[in-house]
Amino acid sequence: MRKSFFCAMVALLTLALTGCSEDWIEEQLAGCQASFIADAYGIGYSLKNENGDRTTTFKEGENIIFDVTIINSTGYELHLADERGILMGIMSVFRSDGEYVGNPFQSASTTSELRWITVEAHGRLHWSYPWIYDKRYAHDDRYDSSTSFSTKVLSPVAPLPKGAYYVMMKYKVMYHIVDNPTPGGGTKGSNDIELRIPFTVE
């Protein structure tokens, strides 16, 4: 049996960095049972200023850098399915009253096939994207996928005016053991999880 996990994600955003028991994983693999392992991976998310400092307070006209890290703390490959555009979701900005402002992507679309992001055992993936287009942050598609995908395009957007904002993400995680003979695929997932990160432009 391949020692590999598949993780299907509605969206992705959390500040937690966690680990899990590989003995427990081995036990689940041996029994070929559906496994929901909430701590198999970690997600690091932060907002940074143009100097690369983490902050939630920005000057008017200053660029905002969305910084994301996916960490696989297990000894197995972790496969994440980008069903609804992970990167688009984590960079969606709202005003404090809930009005949607937008995101820095002009367009993004997928085929009907599932698109997988692979994180190697004990590995990590990292992305940094600006709110205002900056060629120093050229799009780097680090997905590992055998399916076709139309590239997300960073578009010119105006600096955010003064005000209070937040980024919000709802996500849930589903794990499925590869080659699981259980009828129905043997998949189990979490409930929806929501997280907001407020920030201000002064």
Feature names for model-found ranges:
Residues 56-62:
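Short, solvent-exposed loop/linker segments at the N-terminal edge
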Residues 44-52:
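Short, solvent-exposed loop/edge segments of extracellular or virion-exposed proteins
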Residues 15-43:
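Bacterial Sec-dependent N-terminal signal peptides
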Residues 70-74:
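Asparagine-centered strand-capping/turn motif at beta-strand->loop junctions
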